[in-house]
Regions:
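Solvent-exposed, polar/charged alpha-helical surfaces in well-ordered, non-transmembrane soluble domains
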Residues: 96, 191-195, 299, 303
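Hydrophobic-ligand binding "helix-grip"
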Residues: 225-265
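Residues that cap or anchor secondary-structure elements
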Residues: 1-174
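Hydrophobic ligand-binding cavity/cleft-lining segments
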Residues: 91, 169, 173-225
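Beta-strand/loop substructures that line and gate deep hydrophobic ligand-binding cavities in soluble
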Residues: 162, 248-295
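Cys-His-centered catalytic/binding microenvironment captured across papain-like cysteine peptidases
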Residues: 130-137, 145-149, 289-308
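A mature extracytoplasmic/lumenal domain signature
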Residues: 91, 102-104, 159, 174, ...
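Short, hydrophobic/aromatic-rich segments at coil-to-beta transitions
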Residues: 61-63, 81-84, 209-219, 237-246
Length: 308
């Protein structure tokens, strides 16, 4: 298994509940709520790895799952912001589809966001999925995609190319998404941020002018380095978003990112959705003050806009 992925696994294995694997029903995973009470709306969630048959062992911080195919192994990796299921595919004869059944309300849909997919039941977001990826043993990308139907997420991996070097590693990763209610329209919130970004974004080092693509943001929280680069802003009808990417000096480490999305639902609900992918789980897990402070910051961000 890829060593760089093992480095992202936190020491805690009890953050994810693993059960089942009997009577051909798959192995169930339960991800707890992440945000402390009053600091944002998150939803714990349960889903089943349908192609897994049992939880076999723990190796290098990963729970090993046996599967219905001799050519496929699965590994559960707890993350500070959720969980990922790594699927190791040994040959072209292995299945190309890997399905996960989510315990979500009827009518839940998969909605594409900025570098994320969200599970939404119209009036709330239940969590975030990172885009699917698959790489072969040579480090080359393998075509992969998601589909969603009736509570089932399927990752499709195209194993047809003769140039693929096996094994292939594929991954759907579940991360945190925290929701905060807003009182103003998407356009009004965007206008406020464009007029004075640091007036509302509650992190020291934020610039007065709305950031430009590639701009370094020297953000600091106490003594901790939160330096980011501004990746881009994204716009659509009733929707506005922007993304920060962590620099090498950031405590979350290079490769981490965070997305802020302003959305208006068909029922009139307006909200700020903050979703993150954190590489440096060790810092997150060893610093509960950082965890709580993160949610306080984003709660204050929404509050500042609501009070304007």
């Amino acid at each position: 298994l890829a060593p760089e992925l093992l480095a992202e696994s936190p020491a805690r294995q009890d953050s994810i509940e693993i059960s089942g694997g009997t009577d051909g029903e798959g192995v169930a995973l339960t991800v707890p709520d992440l945000a402390p009470d009053g600091l944002g709306v998150t939803f714990g969630i349960s889903f089943t790895v349908d192609y897994a048959t049992e939880s076999d062992s723990v190796d290098s911080g990963l729970t090993v799952l046996t599967t219905t195919s001799d050519d496929v192994s699965a590994y559960v990796q707890p993350m500070a912001t959720g969980v990922r299921v790594l699927t190791a595919i040994a040959s072209a004869e292995a299945p190309g589809d890997y399905t996960y059944t989510f315990d979500v309300p009827e009518g839940t849909s998969l909605v594409e966001g900025v570098g994320r997919y969200y599970l939404s039941d119209d009036d709330r977001v239940l969590g975030a999925l990172l885009p699917p990826w698959a790489v072969d043993a040579a480090g080359e990308s393998v075509p992969t995609s998601y589909s969603w139907a009736d509570g089932k997420l399927t990752q499709h991996v195209d194993l047809s190319s003769p140039r693929i070097s096996f094994p292939v590693l594929a991954d759907p990763a579940w991360g945190y998404a925290v929701e905060y209610k807003l009182t103003k329209t998407v356009a009004a919130n965007k206008a406020l941020l464009k007029k004075c970004f640091k007036c509302y974004f509650p992190v020291p080092g934020a610039p007065k002018a709305f950031p430009k693509v590639g701009q370094l943001l020297p953000l600091m929280v106490g003594p901790a380095n939160f330096n980011c680069t501004f990746k881009n802003e994204f716009n659509a009808t009733n929707w506005f978003a922007f993304q920060f990417d962590a620099t090498k000096a950031h405590v979350d480490k290079l490769g981490s990112n965070i997305v802020f999305e302003f959305r208006a639902l068909s029922n009139g609900t307006r909200y700020l959705m903050v979703s993150a992918y954190v590489v440096n789980d060790a810092f997150w897990l060893k610093n509960p003050a950082y965890q709580a402070g993160t949610y306080v910051n984003w709660k204050n961000f929404a509050s500042n806009l609501n009070k304007a």
